[in-house]
Amino acid sequence: MKIKQIKQSLSLLLIITLIMSLFVPMASANTNESKSNAFPFSDVKKTSWSFPYIKDLYEQEVITGTSATTFSPTDSVTRAQFTVMLTRGLGLEASSKDYPFKDRKNWAYKEIQAAYEAGIVTGKTNGEFAPNENITREQMAAMAVRAYEYLENELSLPEEQREYNDSSSISTFAQDAVQKAYVLELMEGNTDGYFQPKRNSTREQSAKVISTLLWKVASHDYLYHTEAVKSPSEAGALQLVELNGQLTLAGEDGTPVQLRGMSTHGLQWFGEIVNENAFVALSNDWGSNMIRLAMYIGENGYATNPEVKDLVYEGIELAFEHDMYVIVDWHVHAPGDPRADVYSGAYDFFEEIADHYKDHPKNHYIIWELANEPSPNNNGGPGLTNDEKGWEAVKEYAEPIVEMLREKGDNMILVGNPNWSQRPDLSADNPIDAENIMYSVHFYTGSHGASHIGYPEGTPSSERSNVMANVRYALDNGVAVFATEWGTSQANGDGGPYFDEADVWLNFLNKHNISWANWSLTNKNEISGAFTPFELGRTDATDLDPGANQVWAPEELSLSGEYVRARIKGIEYTPIDRTKFTKLVWDFNDGTTQGFQVNGDSPNKESITLSNNNDALQIEGLNVSNDISEGNYWDNVRLSADGWSENVDILGATELTIDVIVEEPTTVSIAAIPQGPAAGWANPTRAIKVTEDDFESFGDGYKALVTITSEDSPSLETIATSPEDNTMSNIILFVGTEDADVISLDNITVSGTEIEIEVIHDEKGTATLPSTFEDGTRQGWDWHTESGVKTALTIEEANGSNALSWEYAYPEVKPSDGWATAPRLDFWKDELVRGTSDYISFDFYIDAVRASEGAISINAVFQPPANGYWQEVPTTFEIDLTELDSATVTSDELYHYEVKINIRDIEAITDDTELRNLLLIFADEDSDFAGRVFVDNVRFE
């Protein structure tokens, strides 16, 4: 079988061309006549469920009607007609003339042959295809799913299958296909729960299946379109122009401009990102032409910490310097009503910055964002409703600021909308009367599914629930949209990353020239963060200043950051292998030999001298150590790190590398025996040598790299694969040279592939409050996904009672946010409410290995749905580690604290507010803590 185009090269435009006569021979209208833009089919009501699908295919010139003005949506479709739709839509051609069915004499035999070769059709049991029979719903499901799987991958059946009241009536051949068609959103049952498998399919049902199928298999060509991504020095002042009937962003010359870039996280938490090296990296290495400065107002932001505004000024100046548009984001979040008292400084804030820059030659780089996410969130003040009334509230807040900013210039203004800026459709129904206004949309690809169609005409606003469809509605109704925040996770920051879904969204945004800013430039431990976070025992947090080279290395980016960088640049996303690791063990940069000495059993040990020279281990006297053969290394000088007091975990290591530095190229031979609790002595299989040709110029001498594998050194493999202990605490090196008396060794490094060690927690059990842990389970407690610590949660004895326990240590290099490295316990319980309780109380025990500096700050957070899923308890419990000796000490020598945190003073919840879950966060306040802790008797009181 021939296929004209496979998915990667089959653009949607080509698909459309291939299926211009999709419904022929059903259509009697002249398909060569040009259509007017008006939808012509009077028998398809604009309020019908099928209208968006038929309109979608008609506007793309995919289908014709049964006459010039009728579509006959409820007429049946034959098996041949639907086969023609699929084969032409997918660009399939038959490669053989051996028609497989008895009834060859039919108008569609070529398309049927192509579909057969692709595995899309199989025919009837009597050996015929029956082209003129009406196609049933189950047959359509089977053919559509086979077509999808032909171009994509085979789908797995969903774990929870869709139950239909007539499931027993679905033929065996179609049972899996009906389930997969539901997953693909191609077909579903009626409102009464019946699939009606034997009922004939209709033209309108075919339109939905074909429209949706083409959307699913269309290539994402627009991911790589960068023609409109222009810097401010190229595009100049921004304006809105009409393009293809929709308002879109353009430069001074009227040609489309798309902004792509990143949003900071809250500047009060991650303000270190505002530095020159970072802005250079974003502009030059990432290709960003825009940055968004997210200045929170509440949540310890501008309202209580006004100096955060200084970071906004710094960010604007850096954006000017490095040729990026800059969004000044008044980050309305908690509370969700921008008219709340905490936001009362908005007018003055925008006026101050507008006045400061109104005469600046790069003033047009600035974009104003007036309200990040209006929402029902009533944490710290009132929220607003997800309806017209909610939009009226936003509009009431925004209009005076818009009027003031319009008097000072024509900079683009972005306005948020209800339901966390997911409702630009509401803004389109009642827009602000001013020039250069765009409306925000926010989405997270794990939570907000795509839609390739809009709504039927007259759909009430209360039923407009798909975020992408809301964007389509806004565009179709005359307003411009800007995606000022989107992420690759779920909306709560967890789960994913959802890159396939992100590709669909970004392809849509790029196709419609909608600008976008990804959330966010942070090393916080959340999926949507762009940088590698701290996770105890796994990763160190990436510095938000990339350093003098002004580039973050790929491994410093998170999965999301690596993906988004590629999408900003419009290049293929090729993720690095994150299972590879390298650990530098001895670098000799401290001016010492780092524990190395001549081994007591070494031959000619009296002739050998070790020293540190130029931050490398120098060996003198090697003219007595000249065996460079592979197996007879025993006569060579033997060194060992007997004086090294440290150890290193080398789980998964497969190679040991050593830099060899010489005055003149020569041959050097090295054999190695790593040592540790799992391996004391095992003879090397061979010595590894480098020859004259391996050396390259290095400073005043030459350098080569010796690579010793686990095959060369069995001890390396023994330690790296031990199920008990993977620490290397020493190494023995056999060193020989051909004719060099002095050489130096440097950068002794192990590398390999990370092996994931399963963290085994004690049984989770049933969520119970009070939590006493006396049943030997965790009683529902677990690590939150954003926890900086995810070590084993076990039940241990503390002060004569069972307690929840874990080990951890805070890092020496501190992020600015003490929560980033904090253990975060998460507890979910049905019908969790405060009731008449005033406190969260529990016993906290410390078994310290190191605890002499700083403090542990214990925070509590509820995540009630009615409060925007975040309600931080205003008070904390502080443990001053410098005064640990003043704590009560138990009989088992644990430090004991009776923790009480006031929950009565939370104004935004009532006694019967559903709290959903409780987080306990043990934040680092410049402490050196390392050890084990215990939590017991968690309760409300």
Curated annotation (Swiss-Prot):
Signal sequence extent: 1-29
The keyword Repeat is assigned to this record: yes
GO BP terms, alphabetized: cellulose catabolic process
Group of enzyme by EC: hydrolase
Residue span, SLH domain: 37-94, 95-158, 161-224
Catalytic reaction annotation: Endohydrolysis of (1->4)-beta-D-glucosidic linkages in cellulose, lichenin and cereal beta-D-glucans
Residues spanning the membrane: none
GO MF, one annotated term: cellulase activity
Keywords, ordered alphabetically: Carbohydrate metabolism, Cellulose degradation, Glycosidase, Hydrolase, Polysaccharide degradation, Repeat, Signal
Catalytic residues, chain numbering: 373 (proton donor), 485 (nucleophile)
Gene3D superfamilies: Galactose-binding domain-like (2.60.120.260), Glycosidases (3.20.20.80)
Keyword Signal among record annotations: yes
EC number, UniProt record: 3.2.1.4
Family stated for the protein in its record: Belongs to the glycosyl hydrolase 5 (cellulase A) family.
UniProt name for this protein: Endoglucanase
Organism annotation: Bacillus sp. (strain KSM-635)
